[in-house]
């Protein structure tokens, strides 16, 4: 237990009997959420343990059972901490506007906008989600937008006002209009 308190990674090397100890596993996932991978199956189904794991590292959702990948609270927390956790959420929750908007609002780091690639296609038609991603991250979020926002003159002008290079992701019809960057 002391080793896990100092470093959650110690769970990876712990004897099997410790991998089923709720207190030890909880301590480990609070330090390193990805240690959920090493927990015994009954503990991987424990809501509190999985919640602690995804709060520490959203990527821990990968090791949660399907029943918890369908939990709004678990997925929302995972998405707050790591938008790419959306990849492991149930299809229903990848189509949940609140969760995808949370992902868009918390994008950070290189390649963060690719988290939107896991969202349901119909949400990539939502201008608020796409604009939030552009504001929080950068123009590359437009890659995942559907054709509708990319073809919306007002939307593209607003995006260009935030990042001039957003114009490169506008629809071909709008890119052919060389006056648009001047309008922004």
Where are these regions (language model features)?
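Non-catalytic tandem-repeat scaffold regions and their flanking low-complexity/translocation tails
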Residues: 1-184
């Amino acid at each position: 237990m002391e080793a896990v308190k100092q470093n959650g990674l110690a769970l990876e090397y712990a004897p099997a009997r410790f991998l089923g100890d709720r207190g030890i596993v909880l301590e480990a996932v609070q330090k390193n959420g990805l240690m959920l991978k090493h927990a015994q199956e009954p503990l991987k189904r424990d809501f509190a343990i999985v919640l602690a794991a995804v709060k520490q590292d959203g990527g821990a959702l990968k090791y949660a059972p399907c029943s918890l990948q369908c939990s709004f609270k678990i997925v929302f927390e995972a998405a707050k901490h790591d938008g790419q956790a959306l990849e492991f959420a149930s299809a229903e929750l990848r189509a949940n506007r609140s969760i995808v908007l949370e992902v868009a609002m918390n994008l950070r780091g290189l390649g963060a906008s690719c988290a939107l690639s896991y969202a349901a296609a119909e949400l990539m038609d939502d201008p608020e989600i796409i604009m939030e991603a552009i504001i929080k991250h950068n123009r590359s979020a437009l890659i995942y937008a559907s054709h509708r926002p990319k073809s919306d003159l007002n939307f593209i002008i607003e995006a260009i006002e935030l990042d001039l290079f957003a114009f490169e992701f506008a629809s071909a019809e709008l890119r052919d209009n060389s006056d648009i960057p001047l309008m922004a």
